Amino acid sequence: MIEKAFSLLAGERLRQLIKENYSSQEEFAFDYPMDLRTVSRYINNGITKIDTIQELAEFFKVPFIAFFEVK
């Protein structure tokens, strides 16, 4: 598990990546595949598991550290 501040940064980065690459959270949830409620929870409450962040980084083809950068 990671610190709350970092998990919130990861959730915000996920929101940005979805916005840049998909027309909606629903479209991303279908493509990933992930339950829409889980996508919403990650965006609003953060991502607490490092392996989940790593999987998302690989999916979006961005470096793992990109989930913790402030933009």
List where the protein language model places each region.
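A short, Lys/Arg-rich alpha-helix, primarily the initiator
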Residues: 1-23, 27
